[in-house]
Amino acid sequence: MARLSAFNFQKWIDEHKHLLKPPVGNQQVWEDADLMVTVVGGPNKRTDYHDDPVEEFFYQLKGDMVLKLYEGGEFYDVPIREGDIFLLPPHVRHSPQRPQEGSIGLVIEPKRPEGAHDAIEWFCFGCGSLVHRAELLLESIVRDLPPVYQAFYADEQARTCPNCGEIHPGKEPPEGWVKL
């Protein structure tokens, strides 16, 4: 068995910087640990909200981000500035927005309990109603989420609001939706 040792995290970030921008945007530090330790780079804007069955810890290493939340029937923004930390409780719908080029955040969350499902939700930009919810067993953020997004973006029926009929734009949020 190999001996445990530390490594320089900034060097790791520098070596993986090419993966911390679109279209990938994030990279897990370890694939085989009980914690999912993910480094996320900007720019990144998304239109979905994540329903996570476990807590998420956010540490904004470089630049600023906004965590859009939907809680108790209300949408609101939580700015997370460079150097800030934030602990998100389980099942609070959230949409991380990192519009700044070169921004870097660290997100730490436990692996899911056996059988626990994550969900990705999209809400109507017109009336605020839930447009679509996709549930999944999440093991790797990098590997498991992209197919869920691609399926939603490709399906106009899934993107049609059942309340007002507006078509969700898919990948691109409306102009001005993200404000730092």
UniProtKB/Swiss-Prot annotation:
Named cofactor requirement(s): Fe(2+)
UniProt pathway annotation: Cofactor biosynthesis; NAD(+) biosynthesis; quinolinate from L-kynurenine: step 3/3
Tree of life domain: Bacteria
EC top class named in words: oxidoreductase
List of residues binding substrate: 56, 98, 109
EC numbers: 1.13.11.6
Note on how the cofactor is bound: Binds 2 Fe(2+) ions per subunit.
Family label: Belongs to the 3-HAO family.
One Pfam family linked to the record: 3-HAO
Binding-site residues for Fe cation 2, renumbered to this chain: 124, 127, 161, 164
Binding of Fe cation 1, residues: 50, 56, 94
GO BP terms in the entry: anthranilate metabolic process; L-tryptophan catabolic process; NAD biosynthetic process; quinolinate biosynthetic process
Keywords attached to this entry: Dioxygenase, Iron, Metal-binding, Oxidoreductase, Pyridine nucleotide biosynthesis
Chain positions recorded as O2 binding sites: 46
Matches recorded under HAMAP family: 3_HAO
Protein name: 3-hydroxyanthranilate 3,4-dioxygenase
Function: Catalyzes the oxidative ring opening of 3-hydroxyanthranilate to 2-amino-3-carboxymuconate semialdehyde, which spontaneously cyclizes to quinolinate.
Subunit structure, as described in the record: Homodimer.
